[in-house]
Amino acid sequence: MSEQTGLSDDASWLQALLEKRRPDPGPVDGRWALGIGDMVADHSLTPDRLRWLVRKLNHFGGVAISEDAVEFDGDSVEWAEIEEIRTRSLIEYLFTGGVDKQIDKLPIPWFPFRRKVLGAISRAALTLLLAAAKQQLEGGALEIRIPAEVRYDGLLRTRELAPGMLAAVILADPAVRQCFEATASAHAVSVTPADDDVMDSADERADQIRSMLDAISARVRALSDG
């Protein structure tokens, strides 16, 4: 995600972490991952003695890209099984319920300051998504598209792997998207826009979109007050 100005302290911290942990350009070499465990471990409220342990929480939310597979929120699919990957605009992802699974509601085990740390990460993630979506809606940025549907060969039918809210924040970072798409290309997996993108008529639905963004803003304020 591109740098944003006027962010809250929580969002600025998360933005800095995303930039610090960006993958190298091109297809992934080995494995790259970033998730909720890394964020909890990096937060100032987390006791030092627990940082190594909370990193194991990444399977509750995050992204992993390896030479063999891609992983969203603990669910992994091998590149060899993937039929295609469809992208959606960040605004559409938000509009179609992508933020319904709040980070502070994840079934993460108790640890000291759990509520405060998860609340801070949730506020930060929502704020970054909201800032990017507003900038895009107002024409101030190029369209941000994230890999929203990883379609793969299931036992009986084609199945889909989709990112949760935290994974979407990570995938919205340009370096992560570039690494993801380059790795997909290296495995001859196509990455194409979804053909049923509901945002094709975004101009006609501007009021609805702004209403949705206002609702996300209200959720951020509620998390701040909680």
Functional labels for PLM-detected ranges:
Residues 76-78:
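Core beta-strand elements of the Rossmann-like FAD/NAD(P) dinucleotide-binding domain
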Residues 1-62, 71-73, 83-226:
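Eukaryotic intrinsically disordered, low-complexity regulatory linkers and tails enriched in Ser/Thr/Pro
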